[in-house]
A protein has these predicted regions:
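Active-site gating loops and adjacent loop-to-helix segments of metal-dependent hydrolytic enzymes
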Residues: 26-57, 67, 91, 95-103, ...
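Active-site beta-loop-alpha junctions enriched in small/polar residues
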Residues: 21, 79-80, 99-103, 135-139, ...
Length: 360
């Protein structure tokens, strides 16, 4: 076993990132679209033009960037399986939600078959460190029948679920009014669009998607009734304040979530949105500093993912997931300190060249 000695350093539990898209790490700085629907379309084009080898490299680079920042656990959504393979190969920890798409009700069976095929490749990778889940992507990319089918699959197989939800005004316009740029794009593909006269949250409630532990990503465009529905379902929220700011979507009502008893975690979203994987910056954007930020990024984020009994604090009986920093936890917003050492399940996954094991 390696031994390290640090002077004037602090040891903290490994940080937990509740929302990433690490297979997109190579796309940082490559999408300058301003309007959200166009930005999404450009991401898809860039991703489709990427080779499988480059996606694998991007996923592994993203994991290593997380570890360099002291992040030991990620909750990642993606469609290629590259992040799951990276975690399994490199020895990381995380939940990987396999995305499924299909806005046309007529393609529901095909989308479900593709999801089943992908899960067939991912299930053998599952371990104590890697959980496999599903992610029906978003209300503008998933039909009502597909939402129901994926929710049923997740219940049968006890799979974790993540959904992008109530992120943008355009999403609300699509679901409530059957109008706006998302509606226009769907109709241009020959897909019928009807108004549902409800919010995106209520749309998923009505289709049985929201349940205990379902990770609802963003939840910016919500009202009091939506918050009550999230609480009653036992759902949890992944808040990505810098991404919401970058896309001008507004701010999630954190105080209202907390007052209602809806658990909230912090994530970074993709580097295509925010340029870096910086959980401390996300905490600062959410108004958290010092010990409050540290608790949120460790135990509270672990609790959102249902992993609080195994990680999130330096307690006897939990996994040895930890990070060492050369300076105290930031008391105010500022540059994120790099980790001097990052350990997952007792194994060193990040160590700068200047840090060497102590001679024995």
């Amino acid at each position: 076993m390696e031994s390290f000695e640090f002077v004037a350093a602090v040891i903290v539990p490994g940080l937990v990132n509740v929302h990433t898209h690490l297979e997109l790490t190579h796309l940082v700085g490559r999408n300058d679209e301003v309007e959200f629907p166009k930005w999404l379309r450009r991401v898809r084009e860039l991703k489709d033009a990427t080779t499988p080898d480059d996606l694998s490299s991007a996923a592994e680079r993203g994991l290593r960037e997380c570890w360099a920042a002291g992040v030991t656990t990620v909750a990642d959504t993606g469609s290629t399986g590259a992040v799951a393979l990276g975690i399994a190969r490199l020895g990381g920890r995380g939940i990987v939600y396999q995305e499924v798409f299909g806005p046309d009700p007529a393609s529901c069976d095909q989308s479900l078959a593709e999801l089943g095929h992908a899960l067939g490749h991912l299930r053998p990778l599952a371990s104590e460190r890697l959980r496999i889940g599903v992610s029906p992507h978003a209300p503008y990319t998933v039909s009502a029948p597909l939402y129901r089918a994926v929710a049923d699959l997740a219940r049968r197989e006890r799979l974790p679920v993540a959904v992008h939800l109530a992120e943008s005004p355009e999403e609300t316009e699509l679901i409530r009014d059957g109008a706006g740029p998302f509606a226009d794009a769907l109709r241009a593909r020959g897909i019928a669009v009807e108004p549902h006269h409800c919010s995106p949250v209520q749309f998923l409630v009505q289709r049985g998607v929201l349940a205990s532990g379902v990770l609802c990503i963003h939840c910016v465009q919500v009202d009091d009734a939506d918050i009550r529905s999230l609480r009653e379902a036992g759902a949890v929220v992944a808040h990505c304040p810098l991404s919401n700011r970058a896309h001008r979507h507004g701010t999630a009502p954190l105080a209202a979530f907390r007052a209602a008893g809806v658990p909230v975690g912090l994530g970074t979203d993709s580097v295509v949105s925010v340029g870096s994987i910086d959980l401390w910056a996300e905490a600062a954007a959410a108004g958290l500093t010092g010990g409050d930020a540290l608790r949120q990024l460790t135990l509270d984020n672990a609790r959102v993912l249902g992993w609080e009994t195994e990680i999130g604090s330096l307690d006897v009986g939990k996994w040895a997931d930890l990070a060492v920093f050369a300076q105290p936890v930031p008391a105010r917003p500022g540059p994120t300190p790099p980790a001097l050492l990052t350990v997952i399940a007792g194994r060193v996954v990040h160590r700068p060249e200047a840090v060497s094991p102590r001679a024995r």
